[in-house]
Structures are given as C-alpha cells and as structure tokens.
Amino acid sequence: MGEKAVPLLRRRRVKRSCPSCGPELGVEEKKGKGNPISIQLFPPELVEHIISFLPVRDLVALGQTCRYFHEVCDAEGVWRRICRRLSPRLRDQGSGVRPWKRAAILNYTKGLYFQAFGGRRRCLSKSVAPLLAHGYRRFLPTKDHVFILDYVGTLFFLKNALVSTLGQMQWKRACRYVVLCRGAKDFASDPRCDTVYRKYLYVLATREQQEVVGTTSSRACDCVEVYLQSSGQRVFKMTFHHSMTFKQIVLVGQETQRALLLLTEEGKIYSLVVNETQLDQPRSYTVQLALRKVSHYLPHLRVACMTSNQSSTLYVTDQGGVYFEVHTPGVYRDLFGTLQAFDPLDQQMPLALSLPAKILFCALGYNHLGLVDEFGRIFMQGNNRYGQLGTGDKMDRGEPTQVRYLQRPITLWCGLNHSLVLSQSSEFSKELLGCGCGAGGRLPGWPKGSASFVKLQVKVPLCACALCATRECLYILSSHDIEQHTPYRDLPASRVVGIPEPSLGTGAPQDPGGTAQACEEYLSQIHSCHTLQDRMEKMKEIVGWMPLMAAQKDFFWEALDMLQKAEGGGGGVGPPASET
C-alpha cells in the first residue's frame, strides 16, 4: 500500500497592527509559530475592498480602533462600495465634502416609524422602505396615506393596504409605495392637526418648459402641482415665470380661501389664493401672485423658513428674528392674552416677537407655539389650558416663557393641545418627552396628560430626527445627515448664574414668587389629605406637575413607591395619572 501524499496546511496568523505604531518586536523569533503577517503589507485597495463588506455599524466601530483603520474606514472608496450595495440604483453621489459617505449613511439610517395610539400593540412599527429613495428629508401623513420626500427630489406615496399575515388579512399602515412625482422641492397640505381635512397635496416642483412653442429649447420653471391624497391623481397645476425660484411652500386659511405662501431663494414671501372646492372641476384659472406684507413693508428682512396653521403664520429670518401673522381674534387672544394690537382689517401685518437670542427653529400649534434659540433653550407661548406649554402649571402665557428643565432639543412639535420634544438623553440613545392633554393615548404612558414635559413610553430610534402626531398615530422619522448639525452655542456665564434673566418683551426681572406660591399650594393640598397613602399619591401627582427633568421625576417616583411599599400600601410603580 503506497502512502498518499497529503499537503501540509498551515494556518498563518495575520497580525492587525497599526502601521503608525510599527510591528511588535520579537514575535518572529518565537519557536513553534509561523511568521505573522501584518495587515499593513496588504495593498490599500485590497484592505478597502475587504472592509467594504462590513455592516455600517461595524465599519464605524472599526474606524475607532486606531489611526490606520480610521483612515482606511473613512476613505471615499469604501463608502462608494457600501452606498452602491445599499442603493444599487444610485449612480450620482451628489455634492458635498464627503458625498459617498453622506449618501451611504443617509440610506443606512433612513426609516419611518409609527405607533398607533389605540389598540393592544404599544410598540413602534416600521413602514415600507422605498428602494428608490435616497434618504428621507421630510414626511407628511394625510387622512389615508403618508408622503415622503427624499434628498434627490423624489416624492413617494406610501399607501395603507390589506395584507395577509399568517393566513389572516390585516390592515397595515404604509406597507406599499409608489412614486408620486420627481423634481419636487417641498410639499404641503391642510395645516390643521386633524388629517381628515388634508384632501389635497400641494407639491412645489421644478419642470422643464418650452421657451417657444414648436421649438426644442426649454428652461426650468418652478410650478405647484395639486394631487388628490386619496389616489395620487394630479388635478391642478400652476407654473411660474422662470425668473422666480422658490424653496418652501405652506398653506393657511380655509378651503374656499386657501392661501399658498411661497418662499423664494432670496428670502421673500409671495402668496396666491385658490378655492379648493373648485379644483376638481376641469377648467382654467387665473391666479395672482402678490408679495406678502412681511416682505413688502420690511424689505430688508430675509426670511429663512416659515410655518403655518389654519389661522396664523410664523416667519423666522436669517438673523434669528421671529414675525407673526394672526388672522382671527380668538387665536390672537390665546397667543398674546389681549386684543389690543389686533387689526381685523389688516391681518397680514407682521408682529415682531421680543426674544433674548437668535431663534433657530420653531413649532406652531393651533393656539400655542414653541421656539428654540441658539443656546438650546425652549420658549413656549400661548394657551395653556391642558398644560401644553410644559411650564408645570396651566396658566396662559402672552409672551415667550422659558421651559428651564429642557435643553438642546433635536426637534419640537406642537399639536392641537399637546406638545412633543425629541431629546438626546445620552450619546447612544434618544427620548421623547411630551406635555399637555393625554386623551386618546396621544401621550403614551400618561393617559390623563401632564402640565410639564415627561418621558413618554416610546422606544425612539437611534437616528430619529423629526416627528409628527395625528389623532390616531405617532410618526417618527429616522435619518442622519453628516453635513447638518444644529449649531447650538454655550450660554455665556453671565446668563447662567448670578444675573437674573430679564422677562421677554418687558425688560423687567422675572418674579420668582409664582414658584413659591405654587409650592405653598402644593403643601396645602398634601395637608388636606387624611391618610399617609393619600399623601403619597398626592405627592406623586405634584412631582408630575413640577418643572423637573425626566430623570429627576423618575427618581422621586421610584423613591415614593419604595416608601409606599414599606408602609404596606403596595402602590404600583410608575407615574400617576395627573388631571388635565
């Protein structure tokens, strides 16, 4: 029997050493071991090709190990391969300092999550992710569907549909998608919080128009296209002169007098009025585009962004100033507490808000608003009947009032009678805070609401950046753009300690007597309770009312639960249901 030659297979050990640190000495001299191979001996193209197969999360973690892997993992060639794997249809990397890395992260982190307020399931669900979408820039839920705009101007139509799950037919949200249109810049619908009013979708887009009939030459012109939200059918289109370019559109007013506000690239506001009740009729319309009074009487102002509601509009300038338009006396009284300066014959005249610092972004509800300045401070103003201002009480505010226990939010949203704040709780987690009316489950975990911002029972995605709530559902948009960062500044030391903050608009120092009076009232309520258990429950409610941070409230509630159990009360763990 002849011997069969078997080749000797040796496993060679590859040493992952940082080239900047150099190879370790004395390893080759060890007996009984093969010669190690440093990864620095591999060609850079081979190393980039190997690590491009890693998931994005692992690639980022590998880049934090040493200087060599940081440079390799940060190479555009690696991110180009990852981007083409995540979005095979994407061929143009776009613009920017790091276009391929930005595109890859946009497509890796994109996602739309929603949580229904009713029903048994109290967890986030994820909508269908369109393969053609290049990241998610903004979204808008309507009565039946959800619309999403990506970073290349494609507007997607996410439909609700009946699907079969384990042999059972179920109605699911945003589980099918189609492309509504391309070349979109912005879109808007009825600004009211109730989605039942959002019948039409107004899309600001760019289209190629022929310069002269019968010729092949064309030029880009901005236009507004109107679609039915139920079917996605286009019912109306208006085209503007090629010299006018817009970047944002919002709506204000009733259906019969719907005003479209258009923001130009130069920061000017134009408006036109349409009658929505006649849009489904096949006929031609002539509309007049006019300069809004905020740009006509204040031509030096350059508006950076705007937001609207049914009866009011808020403008934020590039210098951080805020100007208001209020069109009804009821909303004006809720926002400012008086009708002294309201002129029913001149509703477009802008009103300037007195603020201590530059405003970065804002949110506008039906009769209250929220502002965030350059130092990350949150200011609330308006009606506070349900505690939607988050000040710890239910007193209306006719001027911006700081919510002192919240800092540097990611985004802010104001609804009909409640408010939501997306906050960064730690480096690797985010939390959702809410205040106001909790009826219908709109504040998960707080069925009877809260007069101060409390942590909601919602598992927030790591890259959450925007949110919106309807009567039936909470929506959270996930996306991360490496080129966009909120430029918060550190508050000067003179404003932190030692010097009382002046009251906004009046210049008078704030009176802390309101807090002392509230504490006396709380003690009076505790004293009126007859048993220790009743006093414990009342103290839990008071903790929910007080303007404390979410972690502080959790601490006090946990401590009160421990004391209550020690006395034999056996109270349930968790926050109480405070009155609205």
From Swiss-Prot:
Q: Entry's Pfam families? A: F-box-like, RCC1
Recorded hits in SMART domains, A to Z, give: FBOX
**Which keywords annotate this record?**
Ubl conjugation pathway
Q: How does this polypeptide assemble, per the annotation? A: Directly interacts with SKP1 and CUL1.
Listed name of the protein: F-box only protein 24
This protein's species is Macaca fascicularis
Q: Which gene encodes it?
A: FBXO24
Q: Where are the RCC repeats?
A: 376-425
Q: For the F-box domain, which residue ranges apply?
A: 36-82
Described purpose of this protein according to its UniProt entry: Substrate-recognition component of the SCF (SKP1-CUL1-F-box protein)-type E3 ubiquitin ligase complex.
InterPro entries, from UniProt? F-box-like_dom_sf, F-box_dom, F-box_protein_24, RCC1/BLIP-II, Reg_chr_condens
Q: Tell me which domain of life the UniProt entry assigns to the organism this sequence originates from.
A: Eukaryota
